[in-house]
Design a protein with these regions (language model features):
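Periplasmic-binding protein-like
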Residues: 3, 55-62, 119-122, 153, ...
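Amphipathic helical "hinge" segments at domain boundaries
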Residues: 1-49, 53-57, 135-138
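Flexible loop/turn connectors
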Residues: 95, 166-280
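An alpha-beta-alpha
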Residues: 104-145, 250-267
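Short beta-strand elements in bilobed, periplasmic/extracellular small-molecule ligand-binding domains
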Residues: 24-35, 119-120, 138-160
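Short, solvent-exposed amphipathic alpha-helices that sit
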Residues: 12-26, 102-109, 128-147, 188, ...
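Flexible loop/hinge segments that line or gate small-molecule binding clefts
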Residues: 38, 60-105, 184, 210-222
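Hydrophobic alpha-helical segments within soluble ligand-binding/sensing domains
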Residues: 93-120, 135, 139, 159-168, ...
């Protein structure tokens, strides 16, 4: 089985990959891994390499600009399951998170703590999961009559230097909190906050997706989304094995939408953990 993610070193994907590998072993499958680094050419090359190695099926995290590559895999009747992200108007089995709900509820957690000037830092990529998180953020701000305060800053996935400029400018506008669209962005953002001598959550409160070991963001944040890693891995592999076994009898596709768990920290815990993280940085 071939598993292609955006970055195998990212904790979220690394943990899912491990779950897939463990589950595949029980079914007597060997797993090959690859990373695209959000580059569609790398995805295309990996698909070709894996095909030459005789893989039975693929689990793929689509990257921006790779829609036609994914469609071509499907046209060739290669058993395929999409993970974490989807391709518009393509009948392929997938396992995804309810990202709109996650974006909404993490924003709402900040609002419940009394924050009104909440902005989001996201990627400029048109990925389904990122856009849905942004939509959830916007909907929540509008539902709480804070739509005029809703601002989304977009960064390229390989251009993190701008995040410091964004946070400095936001400080001048008295922004109170940030929602980060990914754990990588949260790590970069927290580093920028500490470099400038600001404190979390006294100067900026944060909410984010997943955990980031470098700064214990999950303890520092007001709220974070804990994604069901085990279910991502097992559900994706189960769907793929089913597709492999029924390869000669194409059937309907299955879309599994997982429910996010929103974890909120106690105010005193967030404060204590942030102070510890600042010292470490």
């Amino acid at each position: 089985i071939g598993v292609i993610v955006s970055d195998i070193s990212n904790k979220f994907f690394a943990d899912i990959a491990r779950c897939i590998e463990n589950h595949a072993y029980k079914h007597k499958y060997t797993v090959l891994f690859g990373s695209t680094d959000e580059n569609p050419q790398k995805l295309e090359n990996l698909v070709e390499v894996f095909r030459n190695k005789g893989i039975d099926g693929l689990i793929v995290v689509p990257c921006e600009g790779a829609d036609e590559i994914i469609r071509d895999i499907a046209r060739q009747n290669i058993p395929l399951v999409l993970l974490d992200r989807e391709v518009p108007d393509l009948e392929v089995s997938s396992v995804v998170l309810n990202n709109r709900r996650a974006g909404y509820e993490t924003t709402e957690a900040l609002i419940r703590r009394g924050f009104t000037r909440i902005e989001m830092i996201s990627y400029s990529m048109g990925l389904s999961n990122i856009r849905e998180r942004e939509e959830g953020y916007r909907r929540c701000m509008q539902a709480h009559e804070m739509g005029e305060n809703a601002v989304i800053h977009h960064l390229r996935h390989d251009k993190f230097a701008k995040i410091e400029e964004i946070i400095r400018e936001a400080r001048q506008r008295r922004v109170e909190a940030f929602l980060f669209a990914t754990n990588t962005l949260a790590g970069q953002g927290l580093s920028a906050i500490f470099r400038n001598g600001w404190r979390v959550p006294q100067d900026f409160a944060i909410a984010c997706f997943d955990t980031n070991e470098a700064f214990d963001i999950y303890k520092t944040a007001i709220a974070y989304v804990r994604q069901p890693i085990e279910r991502f891995g097992t559900e994706a592999l189960d769907l793929l094995i089913k597709s492999i076994e029924q390869r000669d009898k194409p059937g309907s596709c299955t879309r599994i939408v997982l429910t996010p768990e929103i974890v909120e920290s106690a105010p005193e815990e967030a404060l204590r953990s942030a102070e510890e993280a600042a010292v470490k940085s």
